[in-house]
């Protein structure tokens, strides 16, 4: 089902181009899109796959975690991703424990992260496993995926964020088109079933 949300994201890209930086909260427009059944899980797995593809140079335990994530996520359907739940839970816990170091700050506890892409995989798996009905978590995952630190602005949507938002827009267009195709096929099958019943 086609929506206007992707166009709203493209306007954010234009705004970044014009102003240099916009607030991460602009991505809250995604919450409405995530309310549609199945979209949030599909998005979470898509982000996890993108994160695995962007792993960069890694070695040791981090490289092993990336390999396990790639194996788990390979072949999952774009619209209705079904992954091995038990393996996903084990991997999620290993990812969480791998970067489980915190420091105290005046704003509270801050997690120390050395491999951001592994955190994105962890968050994506958590949504797919336990929070597929939480559009707020979907928005936060999108913000974590798109955010960029620039010393002029701090953390926000700037520079490379434009490319990542564009990737999300392409994902949304693809998923909406696949949803439409699936609905058409189901409608066609139902029509054939009804016709068969009438003939009987």
Regions inferred by a protein language model and the residue ranges of each:
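Structured binding/interaction patches within domain cores
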Residues: 2-200
């Amino acid at each position: 089902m086609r929506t206007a949300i992707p166009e709203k994201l493209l306007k954010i890209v234009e705004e970044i181009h014009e102003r240099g930086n916009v607030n991460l909260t602009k991505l809250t427009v995604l919450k409405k899109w995530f309310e549609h059944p199945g979209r949030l899980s599909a998005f979470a797995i898509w982000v996890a796959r993108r994160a695995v593809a962007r792993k960069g140079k890694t070695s040791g335990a981090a490289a092993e975690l990336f390999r396990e994530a790639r194996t788990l996520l390979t072949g999952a359907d774009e619209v209705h991703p079904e992954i091995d739940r038990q393996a996903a839970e084990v991997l999620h816990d290993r990812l969480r424990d791998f970067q489980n170091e915190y420091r105290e700050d005046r704003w509270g506890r801050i997690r120390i992260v050395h491999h951001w892409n592994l955190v994105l995989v962890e968050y994506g798996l958590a949504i797919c496993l336990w929070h597929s009905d939480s559009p707020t978590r979907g928005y936060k995952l999108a913000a974590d995926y798109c955010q960029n630190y620039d010393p002029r602005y701090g953390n926000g949507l700037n520079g490379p964020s434009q490319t990542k938002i564009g990737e999300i827009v392409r994902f949304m267009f693809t998923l909406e088109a696949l949803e439409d195709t699936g609905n058409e096929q189901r409608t066609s099958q139902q029509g054939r079933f009804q016709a068969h019943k009438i003939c009987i």
